[in-house]
Amino acid sequence: MQIAILIFDKLAAQDAVGPYEVMRNVPEWNVEFVAKRKGEVRAEGGLGLIADRAIDEVDSADVVLVPGGFGNRPMLTDEEILSWLRRVDTTTKWTTSVCTGSLVLGAAGLLKGKRATGNWMVLDPLRDYGADPVGGRFVEDGKVITAAGVTAGIDMALHLVAREAGPEVAQAVQLGIEYDPDPPFDSGSPEKAPPEIVELVRSFAAANDQTPVSTGD
């Protein structure tokens, strides 16, 4: 299996790295980071990730994954990226996203008539792209799998491994990375979190949204 994870400046690192850690542990699966231009990109907070190939070098993939992050905004009108996604989608077994990455799939026209999810703060905008937004950790509709925010990418990736390699392999990978969540708080969804916590998160997002998007220059 050949997996291409699209990375870009101001991505949410966990959106890419979480699924990467799951899928790279499957025997004979090759996972690589790709970007508009080969080389380093800087995630939110400054973490550097290296794209081994530029998207114009990638004609096909078994799986393509689009992470989320504040860097998604310019991608929604970036025809170079959107055209590439449409092209590579014709070759994929699975087209996937994490968090706000589903908006990019939508902008590429890949979610029309499909059930899809994403970060809880961007579910409604998915309607603008013809998608049917739903909640949940991940949603599979045809060959498209969209995951909710950040850590949901791990759940989605384990589901994908189970679909392709079987549940035993997926369980072995889960144990290998010791993915056994037991958080100290039960506030991991807006339905569970107290209203004041929901509003605090919204204020954090609004503040971060003012951060200029890096061009990588």
Tell where the protein language model's regions lie, with residue ranges.
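Amphipathic alpha-helical segments enriched in hydrophobic/aromatic residues interleaved with Lys/Arg
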Residues: 136-150
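Active-site-proximal catalytic alpha-helix in oxidoreductases
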Residues: 100-102, 146-158
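Extended, subdomain-level signal for the structured scaffold at the beginning of enzyme domains
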Residues: 1-95, 102-107, 123-125, 133-135, ...
